[in-house]
């Protein structure tokens, strides 16, 4: 029986999408909010290390980076855990890609859009069932007024359900590929194998195609994910406990303040009543 690796791991994700242009084009066209006229037809891979323009700036590395025949840039990230720091890194990397296009003496009008596709194996928007979140720079009162340049797509993989986007066949197939295949998979659904690019991607996930060193790196990746998840859970639990303690302390303090205030008011009322009684007695004497 054939065994498979999980496509979401760093090793497998880069192997599947980092050196196969047509496969990456299929993924991008399926998951990004591109109109028919905006579809990608050809790409060229770019180095995944983003070097800063200024000396002393911060170098960053992304999973997959490419440009198309129009000069548009596409940055793809597979992230196992959500954090505010990751969100800021996404913004930082996309901005750096946009700025890096500027050439000395060049025109700003020649700058091409940057699309950032982020696949998150975590839930970060808990108050909505929507799992695809597209962002761009729009007017706060009229969303039809757009400043072109930066486009962000975040997909919460755990929320994905095929029936919710049944009309988008390729999106469904690629998201099923990312969410349904793992080390426990015994049989690959026929509709995944029937698509040429996804079928080839499935073949590359066969465990027999990896070296012992690659398999060790694969296992190490999941160990690090487990450790990171534990640390995040511990921080979350600690934050809840601290918040609870602060809430109790604040409640006690507020209760004491109210008690003292009520006591003082009651004491003043009693004191005034006693004083009025004494005055009345003197007047009757």
What are these regions (language model features)?
Residues 1-285:
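Elongated, amphipathic alpha-helical interaction scaffolds
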């Amino acid at each position: 029986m054939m065994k498979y690796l999980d496509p979401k791991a760093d090793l497998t994700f880069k192997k599947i999408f980092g050196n196969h242009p047509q496969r990456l084009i299929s993924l991008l066209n399926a998951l990004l909010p591109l109109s028919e006229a905006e579809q990608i037809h050809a790409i060229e891979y770019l180095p995944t290390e983003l070097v800063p323009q200024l000396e002393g700036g911060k170098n960053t590395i992304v999973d997959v980076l490419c440009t198309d025949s129009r000069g548009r840039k596409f940055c793809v990230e597979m992230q196992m855990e959500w954090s505010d720091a990751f969100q800021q890194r996404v913004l930082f990397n996309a901005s750096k890609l946009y700025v890096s296009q500027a050439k000395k003496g060049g025109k700003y009008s020649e700058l091409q859009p940057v699309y950032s596709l982020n696949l998150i194996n975590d839930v970060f928007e808990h108050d909505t069932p929507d799992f695809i979140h597209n962002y761009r720079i729009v007017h706060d009162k009229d969303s039809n007024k757009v400043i072109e340049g930066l486009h962000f797509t975040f997909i919460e993989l755990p929320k994905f359900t095929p029936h919710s986007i049944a009309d988008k066949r390729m999106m469904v197939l690629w998201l099923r590929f990312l969410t349904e295949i793992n080390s426990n998979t015994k049989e690959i659904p026929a509709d995944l194998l029937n698509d040429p690019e996804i079928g080839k991607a499935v073949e590359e996930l066969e465990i027999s195609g990896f070296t012992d060193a690659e398999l060790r790196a694969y296992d190490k990746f999941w160990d690090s994910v487990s450790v990171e998840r534990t640390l995040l859970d511990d921080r979350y639990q600690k934050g809840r406990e601290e918040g609870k303690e602060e809430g109790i302390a604040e409640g006690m303090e507020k209760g004491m303040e109210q008690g003292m205030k009520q006591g003082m008011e009651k004491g003043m009322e009693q004191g005034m009543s006693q004083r009025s009684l004494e005055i009345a007695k003197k007047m009757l004497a």
